[in-house]
Design a protein with these regions (language model features):
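Outer-membrane beta-barrel "beta-signal"
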Residues: 41, 437, 463-477
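Solvent-exposed loop segments that connect transmembrane elements
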Residues: 96-110, 145-152, 202-210, 253-273, ...
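Sequence/structural segment immediately N-terminal to covalent heme-attachment motifs in c-type
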Residues: 31-41
Length: 477
């Protein structure tokens, strides 16, 4: 049995992490590949990775094609590779829980208060021509778990985005009046230039060892690194942005977009109907002085098979509709940014519910709903302040609410169907001794977790038992 360690062990982990960071900072004397490509510092594109500045959004929507290519007729210019690594310490407020099958006391977090190497990523990121560019990220997750819950190292593709772009300029225009392009990506919203959407939204880094709420919408990570999306977009005078894409299971010729995923286990990966999963995005934005603002909407219809191993069945239908907004004030030395998003998902279990009614069980890995339709709603709000792009503080609120469904979420101690309702807040402090090293202290607190404030699992565990203190060191070079 894993025994919970108290304050002194966490203090030792903190000290070790800071020493490790000091060593990393000494080695991080090169900047990532896009900075080498453009000749700009990282802060030109990022408030703090991955939050984009107005210039960063322009760089992304022009297909990552600003600057020089790694290889031109004049010769070799730079290596289009970047590396990111993280180390961390996680403290779970109450690290003991009861195994529902055996009644034994077991740890929630197998490495509570330990200094761990979290993982690392390699980025192939570059302009290829004046009209084509992109990036692909390969990640090693040192804290991935297997079916038995044991920690095992695992690597696979992360976010990928490839773009083909064009530009139209009037006779006297200093910058293109119209940017248009196509994107191929493997995670809905990863192609979006604002940080109010899920793929690159806050929290940008969180503990992989912490307990998290069970329910999330499809567009909020449910399809990442499992699908292939192909679409087109236009951006007019930096004010009007519109995109329409369609998604397909990342198989056959697109299989590289889900490399490393478990495609042989039922439930190991998503399977969606061929190209019958539209994604849309519309946003109005404005820049004036040091300010920029955006208000928009995005969404997706997902027709998903209950089992990725059987695509002969009907599909469950998920309709996600979202609204979002962002504001940035960027000066030297003060920077303030804020993002908000609200996602409304309507779930129609056209395949799964029928199977439950007919056989008493779902199809394959499920889901196994008790209701023919459900809802799931997510709200996120975040504000960040940076001084001199070196000292940062963020406060965020998050909430998920949805239909009570015993088939999906179980029953509470009183015999009522549980809900997915969870909410809480995050407080984060950041310190960047140099622009490609970030030290972070993050505290996540839950007011409600998986449907209840107290005894949410029927074994006496409360929502605030999952409160998490997370110390993280991040370096890119």
């Amino acid at each position: 049995m894993h025994l919970r360690r108290t304050g002194p062990a966490f203090g030792r982990g903190l000290a070790l992490t800071l020493l490790l960071c000091a060593g990393m900072a000494g080695q991080a004397n090169a900047v990532p590949s896009f900075a080498r490509q453009t000749g700009q510092e990282c802060i030109a594109c990022h408030v703090s990775f991955p939050e984009l500045t107005p210039y960063g959004r322009y760089f992304k929507l022009t297909g990552y094609t600003i600057g020089k290519a790694p290889l031109t007729k004049e010769g070799f210019n730079f290596v289009p590779l970047a590396v990111m690594a993280q180390a961390s310490v996680t403290n779970t407020r109450n690290n003991n829980t009861t195994d529902p099958d055996t009644g034994d006391t077991v740890p929630v977090n197998q490495r509570n208060n330990d200094l761990v190497f979290t993982g690392a990523s390699v980025f192939l990121a570059s302009k290829v021509t004046d009209y084509f560019g992109g990036f692909v990220q390969w990640t090693y997750d040192n804290l991935a778990s297997n079916a038995d819950g044991h920690l095992v190292g695992h690597s696979g593709i992360d976010n990928a985005d490839f773009r083909l772009v064009g530009r139209y300029s009037g006779a006297d225009a200093e910058i293109p009046e119209l940017i248009y392009g196509m994107t191929l990506n493997n995670n809905p919203t990863a192609q979006d230039p604002w940080n109010s959407t899920p793929a690159f939204g806050f929290p940008y880094t969180s503990s992989p060892l912490a307990s998290t709420p069970a329910a999330a919408t499809q567009i909020d990570g449910g399809l990442g690194q499992q699908v292939a999306g192909l679409g087109g977009y236009v951006w007019w005078k930096k004010m009007v942005y519109a995109e329409l894409s369609v998604y397909h299971t990342a198989n056959n010729g697109f299989a590289f977009l889900r490399s490393g995923q478990d495609t042989h286990t039922d439930g190991g990966v998503a399977a969606i109907q061929d190209w019958n999963n539209p994604y849309w995005r519309f946003a109005l934005s404005h820049e004036w002085g040091a300010n920029s603002a955006m208000i928009g909407t995005y969404g997706m219809i997902v027709n998903r098979y209950p089992s990725n191993l059987d695509t002969s069945t009907a599909t469950d239908r998920y309709r996600d509709v979202a609204v979002d907004a962002q504001y940035q004030y960027i000066t030297d030395p003060h920077t303030f940014t804020a993002q908000a998003t609200y996602i409304d998902e309507r779930q129609s279990y056209n395949a799964s519910y029928a199977a439950v009614q007919d056989t008493g069980a779902g199809i394959g890995a499920g889901p196994t709903p008790d209701n023919p339709t459900d809802t799931l709603k997510t709200f996120k709000l975040k504000g960040t302040y940076y001084y001199d792009r070196k000292y940062g503080a963020t406060v965020a609120y998050f909430s998920t609410t949805g239909s009570a469904d015993a088939g999906l979420y179980g029953m509470d101690a009183d015999g009522n169907a549980r809900t997915p309702n969870s909410n809480g807040y995050i407080v984060e402090l950041d310190y960047l001794p140099i622009q490609n090293v970030r030290l972070m202290l993050q505290y996540t607190a839950y007011n409600k977790f998986n449907g209840a404030k107290n005894n949410y699992d029927g074994s006496g565990r409360n929502a605030n038992d999952n409160n998490t203190l997370f110390l993280n060191a991040w370096v890119a070079f």
